[in-house]
């Protein structure tokens, strides 16, 4: 919905939100230069063959080489990217916040990958566009996710961390293990002093969580 040609920018509504910052209003409706939205580079099957696809605003249809029967499985790969917005200027659940004092940024990343639309026995595919002020109809599923960030970053996410020894220091890992059996008193895995030390490092190395 953040692409320059997104239909959500021109939808009819009851008026401008009274909580919107003046700077946000100018950037979103007057002189906005930020171009968001997913950029799809390719869609391939597991053999590396390109699959035909059609992008319709906030949705995409992938054409399978053969019909998919109930309980059958089809695997494919998508390469995509998008620009991360300044959350304070453009709002939303996802984005970054910049701190002028030390040059650091905090990233809050949401809705960052393509999701499968719901298919049910009543309506078939749920193919309503996403307008930015509602919620998705989603299928549930299990995900295996690798997230690579600079080594001085601290990752916070849902799910179960698979490689704590690789991304945490020895002290942090010890606290991580202890936290699994401490239910009355929370254990801080990375304390405030350690956070400040990491913030000043600006590591050029990367870690994958």
Write out the residue ranges for each language-model feature.
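Second-shell loop/turn segments in exported
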Residues: 29-30, 61-67
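Surface-exposed coil/turn segments at beta-strand junctions on protein surfaces, enriched
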Residues: 55-57, 69-71, 138
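Short strand-edge motifs at loop-to-beta-strand transitions and within beta-strands
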Residues: 58-62, 74
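Ligand-binding face of N-terminal immunoglobulin V-set domains in extracellular IgSF glycoproteins
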Residues: 1-4, 19-21
């Amino acid at each position: 919905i953040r692409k320059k040609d997104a239909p959500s920018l021109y939808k009819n509504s009851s008026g401008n939100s009274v909580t919107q910052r003046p700077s946000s209003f100018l950037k979103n409706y007057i002189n906005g230069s930020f171009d968001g939205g997913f950029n799809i580079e390719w869609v391939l099957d597991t053999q590396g063959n390109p699959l035909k696809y059609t992008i319709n605003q906030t949705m995409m249809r992938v054409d399978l080489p053969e019909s998919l029967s109930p309980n059958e499985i089809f695997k494919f790969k998508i390469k995509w990217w998008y620009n991360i917005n300044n959350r304070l200027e453009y709002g939303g659940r996802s984005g970054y916040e910049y701190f002028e004092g030390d040059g650091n940024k905090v990233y809050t990343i949401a809705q960052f990958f393509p999701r499968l639309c719901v298919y049910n026995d009543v309506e078939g595919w749920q193919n309503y566009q996403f307008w930015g002020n509602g919620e998705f109809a989603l299928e549930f599923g299990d995900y295996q996710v690798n997230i690579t960030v600079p080594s001085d970053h601290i990752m916070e996410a849902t799910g179960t961390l698979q490689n704590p020894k690789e991304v945490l220091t020895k002290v942090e890992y010890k606290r991580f293990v202890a936290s699994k059996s401490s239910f009355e008193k929370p254990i801080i895995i990375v304390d405030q002093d350690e956070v400040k030390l990491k913030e000043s490092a600006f590591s050029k190395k990367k870690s994958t969580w």
